[in-house]
Amino acid sequence: MHIAALHQPSQVQLNQDGNLKHFLTIEGLSKENLTKILDTAQSFLDDNNNLINRPLLEGRTVMNLFFENSTRTRTTFEAAAKRLSANVLNIDIARSSTSKGETLRDTLWNLEAMAADIFVVRHSSSGAAHFIAKDVCPKVAIINAGDGRHAHPTQAMLDMLTIRRETKKPFEDLSVAIIGDIKHSRVARSDVAALQTLGCKDIRVIAPNTLLPVGFSEYGDHVRLFNNMDEGITGCDVIIALRIQNERIDSPALSSQSEFYRMYGLNKERLSLAKPDCIVMHPGPMNRGVEIDSSIADGEQSVILKQVTNGIAVRMAVLALSMQGQLQEQGLIEAIAL
């Protein structure tokens, strides 16, 4: 079974013309939808991987609503919005009226009344972004910047853009390994869904049983489970290392971090089992010496910093595409090169 089949296609994410209205999850979107995001992001990068500014959202207001701490995701969304000439407001949730007992609905309705065009939302509760898009502020474009263990769609798309740009191979021809804390990782879920939707036929998930989600067998024929890391990464084109999500683990899942590194840490010896041109990725933040050795994180096969740059391009694309209908009305959509 395809992972997308585990969920009802999200009618909330697309408008009546089939264009992106909200970006909440990978599930429910087609290969064409995802390719459109990738192609749009590509248009914001030159041949030297430098970002290209375009004033497509001039006069629009983007509000970053981060109910969970974040550095990389929040700042790249802010950078993306500013490169599109949008006004950006970072709402300090800890000091907002929600800390004084105001409901989430009332907080969001007040922010919507301030003429916000886009909310970028990170929340600890799975499904929070979908709830806001469907039941609270349907007129504001909602971009999910991570909700609990559920989804991190822009991270998945920046990972897909990095894979496409760096391997220069069709997804159908790639072997991709995802290693680490799969159970608690929204990145893993979104990456698997995106890889499947884009046609990857060899997705390898490598983890101890304690860090695998329940019902893993339902993820599909093209997803294989490995408890043995050496076996799992042999012949891979892409390796995505994930950190252990200690903040989401209710009970001990590992005997120790040193034991995890011994069994699942990516080092030079293990990387040599993959293809010679294998690329190494990590969504960050990294725990060096736990899931990845510094020599690999900083090595020639690492594209981790390129992921950060690609993340800005992808978030520019998602922000612009969420306003696509209005941009078309203004005759600006041609500048996105769709």
Curated annotation (Swiss-Prot):
Molecular functions per Gene Ontology: amino acid binding; aspartate carbamoyltransferase activity
EC nos: 2.1.3.2
Protein's pathway: Pyrimidine metabolism; UMP biosynthesis via de novo pathway; (S)-dihydroorotate from bicarbonate: step 2/3
Gene Ontology annotations for the cellular component aspect, listed alphabetically: cytosol
Entry keywords, A to Z: Pyrimidine biosynthesis, Transferase
Protein name: Aspartate carbamoyltransferase catalytic subunit
Alphabetized Pfam families for the sequence: OTCace (PF00185), OTCace_N (PF02729)
Subunit structure: Heterododecamer (2C3:3R2) of six catalytic PyrB chains organized as two trimers (C3), and six regulatory PyrI chains organized as three dimers (R2).
Binding site for carbamoyl phosphate: R72, T73, R122, H152, Q155, G284, P285
Organism of derivation: Acinetobacter baumannii (strain ATCC 17978 / DSM 105126 / CIP 53.77 / LMG 1025 / NCDC KC755 / 5377)
Single biological process term from Gene Ontology: 'de novo' UMP biosynthetic process
Function noted in UniProt: Catalyzes the condensation of carbamoyl phosphate and aspartate to form carbamoyl aspartate and inorganic phosphate, the committed step in the de novo pyrimidine nucleotide biosynthesis pathway.
Matches recorded under HAMAP family: Asp_carb_tr (MF_00001)
Family according to the record: Belongs to the aspartate/ornithine carbamoyltransferase superfamily. ATCase family.
Keyword Transferase on entry: yes
Catalytic activity from the UniProt record: carbamoyl phosphate + L-aspartate = N-carbamoyl-L-aspartate + phosphate + H(+)
Sites where the protein binds L-aspartate: K100, R186, R243
InterPro entries assigned to the protein according to its UniProt record, in alphabetical order: Asp/Orn_carbamoyltranf_P-bd, Asp/Orn_carbamoylTrfase, Asp/Orn_carbamoylTrfase_sf, Asp_carbamoyltransf, Asp_carbamoyltransf_Asp/Orn-bd
Gene of this entry: pyrB
